[in-house]
């Protein structure tokens, strides 16, 4: 079936088959990335722009490496050093990028829906690299890729616990939408004010405490607290108190299955949602996630370029 769309805006709109297509395509690029020479010329003569209106380490660097390994010309755009500071709108910025015959725009923006807005107003393909609290599809795809790599099945036999600031996490939303397509059992746990008001749409179990959240899990995804998106509506306890009730430590990880894996989209707040003895321990596959991000994003960029003809 493949993936035949111009843009990649979220996992909620993807079919199970389309998700599997990306995961299968990523295998080729994972193998390439393990070689001494990591480049190919699939995107030779193509131009990608990483348009980031928010700070990023892993996602922007990963997309840049992905594009360059595919042979594309890559430009990094940051809002703080652009005409955005002079009042230029997102619409005008996208139009100008398209006028320069850009093939793909990788967009990160603080406003939910920004990627869809941009995609409707440019001929370039748009990849949503995170729009507000809405979605972050490439992160969800690399998370699923990592699950498969560690022998976790994408079906009802796998239990995934997502713990932390779910209400403000675009990663959580994309992960949940993608996992639900496969019938994966998803459990959620967070402080009450960090559970989404519309959590029932996820059709997931909401746990009462960390012990219940970790019990019998195959995968635990930890999320940081996103105070920058809180708008003053979160009464944040001390880091020590948060860690006591909502942090993952070496005792709580023992409640999960013996071969459970721990994921985190980063950045990690050590000693808050995740203790170092877990982040650096045998259950952690966090750096493997980062590695897999390059392969998955290569698959995304290559697919969208092929769709452009």
From Swiss-Prot:
The UniProt entry, under SUPFAM superfamilies, shows:
Aspartate/ornithine carbamoyltransferase
Q: Which reaction does it catalyse?
A: carbamoyl phosphate + L-aspartate = N-carbamoyl-L-aspartate + phosphate + H(+)
In terms of Gene3D superfamilies, this protein maps to:
Aspartate/ornithine carbamoyltransferase
- What EC number(s) is this enzyme filed under? 2.1.3.2
Pathway per the UniProt entry: Pyrimidine metabolism; UMP biosynthesis via de novo pathway; (S)-dihydroorotate from bicarbonate: step 2/3
Q: Does the keyword Transferase apply?
A: yes
A Pfam family this chain is assigned to: OTCace
Gene Ontology biological-process entries: 'de novo' pyrimidine nucleobase biosynthetic process; 'de novo' UMP biosynthetic process; amino acid metabolic process
Q: Which GO terms describe its molecular function?
A: amino acid binding; aspartate carbamoyltransferase activity
Write the record's keywords in alphabetical order, separated by commas: Pyrimidine biosynthesis, Transferase
The UniProt entry's GO CC annotations, sorted and at most eight, read: cytosol
Residues reported to bind L-aspartate: 86, 170, 224
Q: Which residues bind carbamoyl phosphate?
A: 58-59, 108, 136, 139, 266-267
Protein's job: Catalyzes the condensation of carbamoyl phosphate and aspartate to form carbamoyl aspartate and inorganic phosphate, the committed step in the de novo pyrimidine nucleotide biosynthesis pathway.
HAMAP family for this protein: Asp_carb_tr (MF_00001)
Q: What family classification does the UniProt entry report for this protein?
A: Belongs to the aspartate/ornithine carbamoyltransferase superfamily. ATCase family.
Quaternary structure, per UniProt, is: Heterododecamer (2C3:3R2) of six catalytic PyrB chains organized as two trimers (C3), and six regulatory PyrI chains organized as three dimers (R2).
What is the designated name of this protein?
Aspartate carbamoyltransferase catalytic subunit
The organism's lineage is: Bacteria, Pseudomonadati, Campylobacterota, Epsilonproteobacteria, Campylobacterales
């Amino acid at each position: 079936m493949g993936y035949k769309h111009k843009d990649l805006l979220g996992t909620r709109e993807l079919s199970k088959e389309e998700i599997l297509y990306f995961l299968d395509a990523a295998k080729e690029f994972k193998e390439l990335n393990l070689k001494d020479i990591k480049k190919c010329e699939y995107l030779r003569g193509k131009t990608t722009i990483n348009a980031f209106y928010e700070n990023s380490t892993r996602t922007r660097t990963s997309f840049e490496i992905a594009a360059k390994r595919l042979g594309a010309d890559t430009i990094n755009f940051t809002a703080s050093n652009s005409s955005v500071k002079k009042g230029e709108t997102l619409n005008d910025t996208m139009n100008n990028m398209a006028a320069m015959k850009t093939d793909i725009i990788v967009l990160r923006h603080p406003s939910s829906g920004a990627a869809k807005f941009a995609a409707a107003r440019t001929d370039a393909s748009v990849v949503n690299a995170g729009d507000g609290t809405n979605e972050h599809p490439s992160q969800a795809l690399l998370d699923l890729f990592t699950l498969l790599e560690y022998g976790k099945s994408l079906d009802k036999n796998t239990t995934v616990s997502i713990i932390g600031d779910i209400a403000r996490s675009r990663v959580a939303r994309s992960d949940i939408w993608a996992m639900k397509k496969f019938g994966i059992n998803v459990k959620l746990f967070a402080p009450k004010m960090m559970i989404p008001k519309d959590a029932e749409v996820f059709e997931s179990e909401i746990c009462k405490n960390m012990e219940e959240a970790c019990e019998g899990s195959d995968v635990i995804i930890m999320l940081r607290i996103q105070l920058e998106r809180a708008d003053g509506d979160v009464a944040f306890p001390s880091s020590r108190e948060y860690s006591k009730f909502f942090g993952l430590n070496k005792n709580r990880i023992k409640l999960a299955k013996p071969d459970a894996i721990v994921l985190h989209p980063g950045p990690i707040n050590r000693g808050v949602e995740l203790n170092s003895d877990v982040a650096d321990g045998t259950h952690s596959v966090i750096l493997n996630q980062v590695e897999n991000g390059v392969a998955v994003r290569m698959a995304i960029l290559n697919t969208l370029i092929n769709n452009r003809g």
